[in-house]
């Protein structure tokens, strides 16, 4: 074990079929995009239903270091008013701490282009392994200077803004194969460039394209003008003064709904999540369809004017054969937990980029599935999970690798496998500050 065997959390078994309603906090992806866009405007913006977790708190801390005010409502900490710097320029000669948050380390560096001095970036030691170079290469193409204080292309580093930004349309080419966040980080700030931006992705595949579409929709919603040519892998953004509406409500995090809705397939019974949007740019919006393919009954009832996603399972799980998860790789750990109990093998493909997430998620999933007696192996672009007899599965102390989705993965296995203990379940605070309470509450209902 690479983590200390302290504060082990015994994952609770599901003693009976579930019948639970679980309210999921706001979307991390949308919360951190809205925070960036609010900071790039000229007027205060109140964000309602903002996720409060380590990642969003790190984002607010980063913005405050740059001179942005983030005022938390005294009545509810999920309402935050963001006020950009009065001068219209971000503070330089400051330190930004990114923790292990990919959205912070890849979205905030772009703001340094508009700072009045150098900005230093650092993070958790584990963050030093996360790739950063494409977005930083993009900023260098825009005239910034990047000084690395460790390995090139990784934290820690200092960004010095250029004396002047390009007056003509900027031409930037990067290989974003490792993460869609490299493209999103540049698109978020592109409208503020004097001549706008023409951004080209030079890699063969574009990972997590729905996340890029989310960014495009959010930039457009703030007044930006983006022309996307996904087949050519290019995005052209006009220079515009962007401003979010004075009040913006954040959708629930549909990817964080995956462990709870997926629990209905593993344990049997029904789980409902309220405030499910009719349309969404979140990749987690694909989840209900995936669960249906695995054998769940899925419906979207409206109760008291609120739209729910309702998932019912009977404890049986259909394997999926070859299954392309390119569009929603972040829910791969939750789907993997369900597929451990499937009737046939599944090859989840299109998710090679998960090797560069909080941990190497493909390697971690294989390790932990094998740890409980399951059968799994890495593929060049994904993961194979094969069925095993139920009696082969057994309890274990499970690693989480400081990765929130590996912790929720372990909890899902614990619904059906006795004696699962989870190391550092507190890592779920990255996106679900009360995961343990929510999970226990689901089982008590």
Curated annotation (Swiss-Prot):
Membrane-crossing segments per the record: none
Residues noted as binding phosphoenolpyruvate in the record, renumbered to the chain: 28, 102, 130, 181, 361, 405, 430
UniProt keyword terms in alphabetical order: Amino-acid biosynthesis, Aromatic amino acid biosynthesis, Cytoplasm, Transferase
GO molecular function: 3-phosphoshikimate 1-carboxyvinyltransferase activity
InterPro entries tied to this protein: Enolpyruvate_Tfrase_dom (IPR001986), Enolpyruvate_Tfrase_sf (IPR036968), EPSP_synthase (IPR006264), EPSP_synthase_CS (IPR023193), RNA3'P_cycl/enolpyr_Trfase_a/b (IPR013792)
Pathway linked to the protein: Metabolic intermediate biosynthesis; chorismate biosynthesis; chorismate from D-erythrose 4-phosphate and phosphoenolpyruvate: step 6/7
GO cellular component terms, A-Z: cytoplasm
Active-site residues, as the UniProt record annotates them: 330 (proton acceptor)
Protein name from the UniProt record: 3-phosphoshikimate 1-carboxyvinyltransferase
Taxonomic placement: Bacteria, Bacillati, Actinomycetota, Actinomycetes, Bifidobacteriales
Name of the gene this protein is made from: aroA
């Amino acid at each position: 074990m690479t983590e200390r065997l302290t504060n082990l959390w015994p994952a609770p078994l599901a003693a009976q079929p579930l019948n639970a309603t679980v309210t999921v906090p706001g979307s991390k992806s949308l919360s951190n995009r809205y925070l960036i866009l609010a900071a790039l405007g000229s007027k205060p913006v109140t964000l309602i239903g903002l996720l409060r977790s380590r990642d969003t708190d790190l984002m607010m801390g980063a913005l405050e270091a740059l001179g942005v005010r983030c005022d938390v409502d005294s009545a509810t900490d999920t309402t935050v008013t963001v006020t950009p710097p009065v001068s219209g320029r971000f503070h330089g000669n400051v330190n930004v701490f990114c923790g292990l948050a990919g959205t912070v380390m890849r979205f905030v560096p772009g703001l340094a282009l508009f700072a009045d001095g150098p900005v230093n970036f650092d993070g958790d030691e584990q963050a030093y392994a996360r790739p950063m170079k494409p977005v930083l290469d993009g900023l260098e193409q825009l005239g910034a200077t990047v000084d690395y204080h460790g390995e090139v292309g990784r934290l820690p580093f200092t960004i010095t803004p250029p004396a002047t930004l390009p007056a003509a349309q900027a031409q930037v080419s990067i290989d974003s194969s490792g993460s869609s966040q490299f493209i999103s980080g540049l698109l978020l700030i592109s409208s503020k460039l004097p001549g706008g931006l023409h951004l080209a992705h030079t890699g063969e595949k574009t990972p997590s394209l729905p996340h890029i579409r989310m960014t495009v929709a959010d930039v457009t919603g703030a007044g930006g003008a983006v022309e996307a040519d996904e087949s050519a892998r290019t995005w052209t953004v006009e220079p515009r003064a962007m401003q979010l509406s004075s009040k913006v409500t954040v959708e629930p995090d549909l990817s964080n709904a995956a462990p709870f809705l997926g629990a209905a397939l593993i344990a049997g019974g029904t789980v409902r999540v309220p405030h499910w949007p009719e349309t969404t740019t979140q990749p987690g919006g694909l989840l209900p369809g995936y669960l249906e393919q695995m054998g769940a009954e899925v419906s979207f009832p409206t109760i008291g004017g609120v739209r729910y996603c309702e998932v019912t399972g009977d404890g049986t799980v259909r394997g999926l054969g070859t299954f392309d998860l390119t569009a929603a790789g972040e829910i791969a750990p939750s789907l993997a937990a369900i597929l451990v109990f499937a009737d046939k093998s599944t090859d989840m493909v299109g998710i090679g980029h998960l090797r560069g997430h909080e941990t190497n998620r493909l390697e971690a999933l294989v390790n932990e599935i094998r740890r409980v007696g399951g059968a799994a192996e890495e593929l060049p672009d994904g993961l194979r999970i094969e069925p095993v007899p139920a009696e082969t599965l057994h309890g274990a102390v499970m690693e989480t690798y400081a990765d929130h989705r590996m912790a929720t993965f372990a909890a899902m296995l614990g619904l059906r496998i006795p004696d699962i203990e989870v190391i550092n379940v507190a890592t779920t605070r990255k996106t679900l500050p009360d995961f343990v309470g929510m999970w226990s509450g689901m089982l008590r209902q």
